[in-house]
């Protein structure tokens, strides 16, 4: 089996192939190390290679083992809250607690698997991801052309993502921007930290206070970059950690199984084939709303009005 892709935006080879093939980075690296990837007709064994617009990537699947893991995401019958769907893409309101992509631990239930089932068991492609316990709007493409188009928008910041978070303690400044680079915590495969090192990646988050009291604040956030755990690490850095965050929250806080109170409430982009602006709002989960009420916080307006 052979596949060929024309690159539309500058990106790392392993990151791009992970999206195009619905694979983990680990599995993509195996393909590269096995000599199954060509860039502009030349074999490459460098997973960190930066590919540029109009580069041609060829993937050759020449053994059963590799073919097996290319198609390893099994469809999973799970009811989805579909905010929009057409022949090119879906916008889903992902529930808290659901993996976006299967891990190596053989979980069958994931957003990707559910979308494959919903799409008559045909392949789908993730434009971006949400943490397991982060709920909200996520875009899933039905073809690779739409995927490449939206990933290009993501890199050029014409695809915009907005979140709401319930955080500890009131703010002095009601608006602000957090510009602090992120890197992995040493000897930790899961956690990230603020760092000023060569491996740290630029990360920028804008925030605005919606409502607050002496204990907590409900804030809106816009991602200007899309690093793993970016919002959660940034909010810990400015001493307003997300409520119930198992990784970056207050250690003494009594936590429940819901996970962090972080919700991707809005996503905007240009439709890849219709070429018109699209704007979607994902409602809060009932448990999130209940938590707000328990802290005497409320939305001054519905989310779809507040973030127009």
Curated annotation (Swiss-Prot):
SMART domains in UniProt: S4
SUPFAM superfamilies tied to this protein: Alpha-L RNA-binding motif (SSF55174), Pseudouridine synthase (SSF55120)
InterPro entries, sorted: PsdUridine_synth_cat_dom_sf, PsdUridine_synth_RluA-like_CS, PsdUridine_synth_RluC/D, PsdUridine_synth_RsuA/RluA, RluA_PseudoU_synthase, S4_RNA-bd, S4_RNA-bd_sf
EC class name: isomerase
EC assignment: 5.4.99.-
Active site: 131
Keywords: Isomerase, RNA-binding
Reaction(s) this enzyme catalyzes, per UniProt: a uridine in RNA = a pseudouridine in RNA
GO MF terms held by the record: pseudouridine synthase activity; RNA binding; rRNA pseudouridine synthase activity
Highest taxon of the lineage: Bacteria
BP GO terms, sorted: enzyme-directed rRNA pseudouridine synthesis
Keyword Disulfide bond found: no
Residue ranges annotated for the S4 RNA-binding domain, each copy included: 11-87
One Pfam family per UniProt: S4
Family: Belongs to the pseudouridine synthase RluA family.
Name assigned to this protein: Uncharacterized RNA pseudouridine synthase MG209
Organism: Mycoplasma genitalium (strain ATCC 33530 / DSM 19775 / NCTC 10195 / G37) (Mycoplasmoides genitalium)
């Amino acid at each position: 089996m052979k596949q060929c892709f024309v690159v539309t935006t500058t990106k790392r080879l392993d990151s791009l192939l992970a999206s195009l093939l619905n694979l983990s980075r680990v599995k993509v690296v195996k393909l590269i190390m096995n000599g199954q990837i060509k860039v502009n007709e030349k074999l490459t064994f460098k997973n960190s290679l930066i590919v540029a617009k109009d580069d041609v990537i060829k993937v050759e699947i020449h053994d059963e083992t590799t073919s097996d893991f290319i198609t390893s995401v099994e469809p999973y019958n799970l009811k989805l809250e579909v905010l929009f769907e057409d022949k090119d893409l879906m916008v889903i309101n992902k529930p808290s607690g659901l993996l976006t992509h299967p891990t190596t631990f053989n979980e069958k239930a994931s957003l990707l698997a559910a979308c494959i089932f919903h799409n008559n068991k045909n392949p789908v492609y993730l434009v971006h991801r949400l943490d397991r316990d982060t709920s909200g709007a996520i875009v899933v493409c039905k073809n690779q052309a739409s995927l490449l188009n939206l990933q290009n928008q993501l890199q050029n910041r014409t695809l915009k993502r907005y979140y709401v978070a319930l955080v500890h303690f009131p703010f002095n400044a009601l608006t602000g921007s957090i510009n602090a680079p992120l890197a992995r915590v040493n000897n930790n495969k899961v956690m990230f930290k603020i760092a000023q090192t060569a491996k740290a990646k630029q990360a920028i988050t804008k925030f605005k206070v919606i409502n607050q009291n002496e204990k907590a604040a409900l804030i809106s956030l816009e991602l200007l970059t899309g690093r793993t755990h970016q919002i959660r690490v940034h909010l810990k850095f400015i001493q307003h950690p997300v409520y119930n965050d198992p990784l970056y929250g207050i250690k003494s806080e009594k936590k429940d199984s819901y996970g962090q109170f972080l919700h991707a409430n809005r996503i905007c982009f240009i439709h890849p084939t219709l070429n018109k602006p699209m704007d979607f709002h994902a409602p809060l989960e009932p448990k999130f709303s209940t938590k707000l009420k328990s802290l005497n916080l409320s939305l001054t307006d519905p989310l779809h009005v507040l973030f127009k």
